[in-house]
């Protein structure tokens, strides 16, 4: 059914890292027969906490990938990192996919599977522990990962909510 292409990692002149996660062959059934096409899923990151996801469809693979990359660039969001990892543990969800993302100590590396690994690599995360729970559909896993990252809050945001200083929060 769905074919996953090997992930490619490119860096363009604008300093953004691009990674193709999957390319699927899709079929539209019409009165005259079947129309074949391709759907591509990509992520783009700036290596400093910026991440964007895009999907594109077309009759040819390169056009689908290009559309996906353009959408990913438009949807770029910034996530706060702390020394190449995250501030706290978080769970993200999309559809039947749930992801658990935990900060890791220096030297751990990226311990995450498939689509999540691609997201962390283009973001510039060096140390993270992540687990995919439920569906492993690449689209849902990437959306769940970004959902979890959007839920992440910095110590300064938590301190502002509680009306305390950052030192009280970080201990």
Swiss-Prot record:
Q: What is the UniProt domain comment for this protein?
A: The N-terminal domain interacts with the head of the 30S subunit; the C-terminal domain interacts with the body and contacts protein S4. The interaction surface between S4 and S5 is involved in control of translational fidelity.
| Species this protein is from | Thiobacillus denitrificans (strain ATCC 25259 / T1)
Keyword Ribosomal protein, does the record have it?
A: yes
Q: What does this protein do?
A: With S4 and S12 plays an important role in translational accuracy. Located at the back of the 30S subunit body where it stabilizes the conformation of the head with respect to the body.
Record-linked InterPro entries: Ribosomal_Su5_D2-typ_SF, Ribosomal_uS5, Ribosomal_uS5_bac-type, Ribosomal_uS5_C, Ribosomal_uS5_N, Ribosomal_uS5_N_CS, Ribsml_uS5_D2-typ_fold_subgr
Record-level GO cellular component terms:
small ribosomal subunit
Q: Which SUPFAM superfamilies match?
A: dsRNA-binding domain-like, Ribosomal protein S5 domain 2-like
GO molecular function terms attached to this record: rRNA binding; structural constituent of ribosome
Which residues belong to any copy of the S5 DRBM domain?
A: 16-79
PROSITE patterns linked to this entry: RIBOSOMAL_S5, S5_DSRBD
What does the subunit section of this Swiss-Prot or TrEMBL entry state? Answer: Part of the 30S ribosomal subunit. Contacts proteins S4 and S8.
* Keyword annotations: Ribonucleoprotein, Ribosomal protein, RNA-binding, rRNA-binding
Q: Which Pfam families match?
A: Ribosomal_S5 (PF00333), Ribosomal_S5_C (PF03719)
Is the RNA-binding keyword given for this protein? yes
Return the protein name.
Answer: Small ribosomal subunit protein uS5
Family per UniProt? Belongs to the universal ribosomal protein uS5 family.
User: Biological process GO annotation list?
Assistant: translation
């Amino acid at each position: 059914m769905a074919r996953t292409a090997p992930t490619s990692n490119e860096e363009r002149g604008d300093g953004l890292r691009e990674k193709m996660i999957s390319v699927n062959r899709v079929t539209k059934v019409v009165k005259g027969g079947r129309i074949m096409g391709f759907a591509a899923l990509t992520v783009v990151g700036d290596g400093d906490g910026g991440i964007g996801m895009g999907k594109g469809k077309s009759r040819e693979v390169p056009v689908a990938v290009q559309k996906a990359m353009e959408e990913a660039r438009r949807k770029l969001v910034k996530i706060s990192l702390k020394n190449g990892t995250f501030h706290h543990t978080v769970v993200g969800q999309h559809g039947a996919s749930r992801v658990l993302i935990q900060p890791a100590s220096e030297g751990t590396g990226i311990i995450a599977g498939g689509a999540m690994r691609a997201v962390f690599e283009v973001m510039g995360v060096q140390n993270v522990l992540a687990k995919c729970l439920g569906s492993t559909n690449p689209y849902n896993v990437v959306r769940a990962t970004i959902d979890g990252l959007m839920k992440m809050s910095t110590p300064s945001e938590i301190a502002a909510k509680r009306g305390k200083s950052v030192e009280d929060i970080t201990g």
